[in-house]
Amino acid sequence: MKLISASLRRFSLAVLTILLVVSSFAVFTPSASAETYQVKLGTDKGLLAFEPKKLTIKPGDTIEWVNNKVPPHNVVFDPAKNPSKNADLAKSLSHKKLLMSAGQKETTTFAADAPAGDYTFYCEPHRGAGMVGTITVQG
């Protein structure tokens, strides 16, 4: 009987030790933190373009749009050119209000469950001049 009791105690101690070690990995594993990226509206050289024009992000990341040169600018996501072709999603990501002064900022955060793929955006006043860009959300 003492042998069974001692074996049971050792087994319980081993199980508790394993649980403690495994749970410590969950506590000390760094979580993937969201990043913030900056996109300039108008290049430093005064061109009507986004800088950078193409950007790859992960769900949960944020884009900070900074009015740089040759205003006014805004950021509109094309409802026909996002992975889900969802007009409400495009509207929620867009900032249609014109930024008139250099240094003005807006932010767009892609939800943690944002569909992976390419999202096309443009500046309404300068779309005809080619002020268009792409955000690629990784899956």
UniProtKB/Swiss-Prot annotation:
Short name of one Pfam family: Copper-bind
Cofactor annotation: Cu(2+)
Record carries keyword Acyltransferase: no
Subcellular location: Cellular thylakoid membrane
Highest taxon, organism lineage: Bacteria
Signal peptide: 1-34
UniProt domain Plastocyanin-like: residue ranges: 35-139
CDD domains: Plastocyanin (cd04219)
Keywords: Copper, Electron transport, Membrane, Metal-binding, Signal, Thylakoid, Transport
GO molecular function, one term: electron transfer activity
Stated role: Participates in electron transfer between P700 and the cytochrome b6-f complex in photosystem I.
Protein name, entry field: Plastocyanin
Gene source species: Nostoc punctiforme (strain ATCC 29133 / PCC 73102)
